[in-house]
Amino acid sequence: MFIESFKVESPNVKYTENEIHSVYDYETTEVVHEKTVNGTYQWIVKPKTVKYDFKTDIRVPKLGVMLVGLGGNNGSTLTAGVIANKEGISWATKDKVQQANYFGSLTQASSIRVGSFNGEEIYAPFKSLLPMVNPDDVVFGGWDISDMNLADAMARARVLDIDLQKQLRPYMENIVPLPGIFDPDFIAANQGSRANHVIKGTKKEQVDHIIKDMREFKEKNKVDKVVVLWTANTERYSNEVVGMNDTMEDLMESVDRDEAEISPSTLYAIACVLEGIPFINGSPQHTFVPGLIDMAIRNNVLIGGDDFKSGQTKMKSVLGDFLVGAGIKPTSIVSYNHLGNNDGMNLSAPQTFRSKEISKSNVVDDMVASNGILFEPGEHPDHVVVIKYVPYVADSKRAMDEYTSEIFMGGKNTIVMHNTCEDSLLAAPIILDLVLLAELSTRIQFKSEGEGKFHSFHPVATILSYLTKAPLVPPGTPVINALSKQRAMLENIMRACVGLAPENNMIMEFK
């Protein structure tokens, strides 16, 4: 059974006009290596319970979202999709009359289990857990190095059906991105022809320009909060250099000196941190150099990334987890992609492809490390990623994967998968989820037993991991890539905010 909404009744939950307060017992384990009476060591696992207080502000703000790369395939597709949903637009395809929807969005189109009733499982919308911004109410803006209006950008992208594009054109032809930061050293040379709409000046002047743009956007649109997300070209990997970008002070001094190695994406992120605005990196480049992470932590400003997890990598994070969890040993993973959109064109340059290769290649690391029966220390499956540019297929990316595994008694198992990933139609709802969850997380505060004051989540937002290929985590935090664990983490944190136990799937009431 599916219900649209619910309210929790519990002595551990209190609803006020502006907040939800919950008291939550977090049950976990502590693992220690102890010396026994005979002088040997053994591993001891000790269950423990930590009491947490959560406080969630339920006043939903008017949200503005500024996209870096607003005129790209993702930016134009997302903006078009939100307008179509808000206006209730329908259009004819070769199969049927299609209604606008938010399919592919975790927050808008997925469900969570809330319990059982008369022997039947009860589910509710994911978005019913906590008050969230309605995507129809989001105000979009942003930057692009191309001055093309969003109606023409939508046509250039070749993602949406023509009938839909015709209906959306009046809403989009007057939306023109702000000029963007362009540095030809960081992206493929083939992008130069699009760069007719750029911010001039030194890196310091560019940061100041972005800050001015964000302030004016917020004032003009009368929004309460702004979230900025990078959905522009993948940059080449930025080098970490001691004395240049390893601390906040060094990074800011490097900006003042106009150091060449400070990338455009890092400049946008710096501007956001200085303004207290959340910044999310949707591409695989090394935006978050150590100095920027240091800066975000010291200023307590949310940052998240890296790289949207939409197609091939999402499947890999499921299949890899399944194989290792089933006691099957993956020994070779070969991934081949070809696509024909501007992302593929930019990735045809070796230096930008390297960023994507790094992002895609680490996705099974935590799964391999979890099973010392299958893998010796340091052992890892052979893992190869290939991406080729084929203009004809446009945004309809093809992903082909071959998984070779060792099974019982020396046997071999091979799984081959072909995945047609409509690139921007998969990425757009993920962008939506990222900005909505980033905003929501800024309204949640908590404290553990013994702490005097409530505080926000760590600025490095692991809560967004489900949506990213290479999750950014705080220093010293394990990276979790298994998709089921990432979703469980996100859902269970939100459940804790309303005093609900984590979904453990034991269903003891039916045993």
Swiss-Prot record:
Pfam families reported in the protein's UniProt record: Inos-1-P_synth, NAD_binding_5
GO cellular component annotations of the record: cytosol; nucleus
Positions contributing to NAD(+) binding: 71-74, 144, 181, 191, 194, 231-234, 282-283, 307, 310, 341-343, 356, 394-395, 423-424
GO biological process: inositol biosynthetic process; phospholipid biosynthetic process
Main location: cytoplasm
UniProt EC number: 5.5.1.4
Tagged with keyword Nucleus: yes
MF term (GO), any: inositol-3-phosphate synthase activity
Pathway: Polyol metabolism; myo-inositol biosynthesis; myo-inositol from D-glucose 6-phosphate: step 1/2
Cofactor: NAD(+)
Keywords linked to the UniProt accession: Cytoplasm, Inositol biosynthesis, Isomerase, Lipid biosynthesis, Lipid metabolism, NAD, Nucleus, Phospholipid biosynthesis, Phospholipid metabolism
Cellular localisation: Cytoplasm, Cytosol; Nucleus
Record has NAD as a keyword: yes
Cited InterPro entries: Myo-inos-1-P_Synthase, Myo-inos-1-P_Synthase_GAPDH, NAD(P)-bd_dom_sf
Catalyzed chemical reaction(s): D-glucose 6-phosphate = 1D-myo-inositol 3-phosphate
Domain of life of the organism encoding this protein: Eukaryota
Function noted in UniProt: Key enzyme in myo-inositol biosynthesis pathway that catalyzes the conversion of glucose 6-phosphate to 1-myo-inositol 1-phosphate in a NAD-dependent manner.
PANTHER family found in the cross-reference section: MYO-INOSITOL-1 PHOSPHATE SYNTHASE
Family: Belongs to the myo-inositol 1-phosphate synthase family.
Name of this protein: Inositol-3-phosphate synthase
Upper classification of the organism: Eukaryota, Viridiplantae, Streptophyta, Embryophyta, Tracheophyta
